[in-house]
Design a protein with these regions (language model features):
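Gly/Ala-rich phosphate-binding loop of Rossmann-like dinucleotide-binding domains
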Residues: 48, 52, 189
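Beta1/beta-strand and adjacent pyrophosphate-binding region of the FAD-binding site
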Residues: 29-43, 61
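Glycine-rich FAD pyrophosphate-binding loop
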Residues: 52-75
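Helical element adjacent to the flavin cofactor pocket in flavoenzyme catalytic cores
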Residues: 169-226
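Short loop/edge segments at beta-strand edges and connector loops
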Residues: 64, 117, 152-153, 199-201, ...
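N-terminal mitochondrial targeting presequence
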Residues: 1-31
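Dinucleotide-binding Rossmann-like beta1-alpha1 core, especially the glycine-rich loop
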Residues: 79-159, 165
Length: 226
């Protein structure tokens, strides 16, 4: 077997060993880190971006197994900007959904990301579904979903002529966006703030090392010592 060429990136309290042919992106000249995020989807880049923007003294890195951001779930979903109707009232998820709704539109507008506030209809197609629809409407009200209302069949046709139903919830602030594009903007923000990205780094395992004093993060050809 041909030996793997190794380079070492020194980090605060740990070292990153990586193949020399791996792509490394950074505006930051230092190679010392305080925090490393694993995973380059929207959650990973949002987390890394928030960490470095709120803690400018930290040196933050991110590793991703693919050669670009949002290859998997973040780039393959329905693309909905949710307005907070479905989640259990009082939960963190419900609260964050409403807050995220406004922040998403603000971020997309600021960064010229294509998006559309198209609205959404949740339709009861027959009388037997009305109770469930009413319950969902009450949940949306309790969550603070903005401007939702119950409408009848005629109003449904006004909004969407090809939709048939006896009653519906109209959520005018629900929208659509390509979350893969949002993720790429988060990645650019992260790098512009001094973050560092290593692509083609697939983490395979985490192992305790030397009596709980360090952690080995292992990929197919790389070892990260924490």
């Amino acid at each position: 077997m041909k030996p793997v060429q190794i380079t070492t990136i020194k980090m605060k309290n740990f070292k990153l060993f990586s193949n020399s042919n791996k792509r490394l992106y950074s505006k930051c000249k230092t190679n010392s880190y305080d925090v490393l995020v694993v995973g380059g989807g929207i959650v990973g880049f949002a987390t890394a971006r928030a960490l470095i923007s709120r803690n400018k003294h930290l040196h933050v890195g991110l590793v991703e197994k693919e050669n670009r951001p949002s290859v998997h779930q973040s780039g393959h979903n329905s693309g909905v900007i949710h307005a907070g109707i479905y989640y259990k009232p009082g939960t963190m998820r419900a609260k964050m959904c409403i807050e995220g709704l406004y922040k998403t539109y603000e971020y997309c507008a600021k960064n010229n990301i294509p998006h559309k506030k198209c609205g959404k209809l949740i339709v009861a197609t027959n009388e037997s579904q009305i109770k469930s629809l009413n319950d969902l409407y009450e949940r949306g009200l309790e969550n603070g979903t903005p401007d939702i209302k119950l409408i009848n069949g005629n109003d449904i046709k006004t909004i969407e002529p090809y939709c048939n139903g006896v009653r519906a919830i109209h959520s005018p602030h629900t929208g659509i966006v390509d979350w893969a594009v949002v993720t790429k903007h988060y990645a650019a923000d992260f790098v512009n703030l001094g973050g560092q990205i290593t692509y083609n780094f697939k983490v395979k395992s985490f192992e305790e090392y030397k009596h709980n004093r360090a952690l080995r993060i292992i990929s197919e050809k790389n070892v990260l010592l924490l």
